Amino acid sequence: MLDPRARTLLKTLIERYIADGQPVGSRTLSRYSGLELSPATIRNVMSDLEELGLVSSPHTSAGRVPTPRGYRLFVDTMLTVESPIDSDAVTRLVQTTLQAGEPQQKVVAAAASVLSNLSQFAGVVLTPRRSHVFKQIEFLRLSDKRILLIIVTPEGDVQNRMIATQRDYSPAQLTEASNYINAHFAGLSFDEVRRRLRGEIDELRGDMTALMHAAVTASTEEPADEETVLISGERNLLEVADLSSDMARLRKLFDVFDQKTSLLQLLDVSSHAQGVQIFIGGESTLVPIDEMSVVTAPYEVNGKIVGTLGVIGPTRMAYNRVIPIVDITARLLSLTLSQQ
């Protein structure tokens, strides 16, 4: 445990380093900490913090910078989340951008853009898993023996499938089949529909049964549980010296964006937690770059967590500003999707 004096100096050091991006010396700490301490006393405290692994000394400077462990202590125990921007203005902007009634994919993509614009870093969203369950289906006759199957999920996502049939169906027959399925099976997975059809096959005409089996087969041909990572504002990170000053680091950063595997893993872990999570590079093995941090929060549809969103930026980010941006966006995205 740190004593109050050491906590104050560590908090001041991290706040000044986030603001200025330069190693922090004893004179700066004396000026901003509010403590009446001699430079020698401050240097002694800094040496103690360095032994604890909370700060380090760059070879080219007499000042010190926070380590990942120091950042972790700061965000867990010292951070006061008071956004310098008007939270009401943020709320209005997010509400204006996230329009209820729009396709789910468009709303989720808009959330990534909002996060990027507000944070000036990269916004990232893990899209909801494709639903195994359907809310409504419709058959549309395209030509002889070719039918378009339209599937509407409970989240409002619309999926289309092509069905090749053994015979021609009239529009009236297609309406009859879709009405039967919607009346008896809406809210179930297509695997469950398949099982139910086996038990109810005697109640249906053979041609209707064949059409329904074709619909079930078509609906399950594509993976239902694929997740996608949407990223907006990657180019903002080119303006961040901490991430872009080294070409190898920059190449690794864009490899992360291109492959998305590590981001998918990190966001998936975040979806199992409540509230805002902070992953600090160099401390969390989930963050692939030491100088990068990710602030995430899960979002919901009708009370059920379906995905995660967040901001990717430098470890030296204004956490007190980014955290409320992520939190407000997650809450309003949840509200918008639940109104679909």
UniProtKB/Swiss-Prot annotation:
- Alphabetized InterPro entries for the sequence: GAF-like_dom_sf, HrcA, HrcA_C, WH-like_DNA-bd_sf, WH_DNA-bd_sf, WHTH_HrcA_DNA-bd, WHTH_transcript_rep_HrcA_IDD
SUPFAM superfamilies listed in its UniProt record: GAF domain-like, Winged helix' DNA-binding domain
**Keywords on record:** Repressor, Stress response, Transcription, Transcription regulation
HAMAP family from the entry? HrcA
Q: What species was this sequence derived from?
A: Burkholderia thailandensis (strain ATCC 700388 / DSM 13276 / CCUG 48851 / CIP 106301 / E264)
Q: Name one Pfam family in it.
A: HrcA
**Protein purpose:** Negative regulator of class I heat shock genes (grpE-dnaK-dnaJ and groELS operons). Prevents heat-shock induction of these operons.
GO molecular function terms attached to this record: DNA binding
Spell out the protein name for this chain.
Heat-inducible transcription repressor HrcA
- Similarity comment: Belongs to the HrcA family.
Keyword match Transport: no
> What's a GO biological-process term for it?
negative regulation of DNA-templated transcription
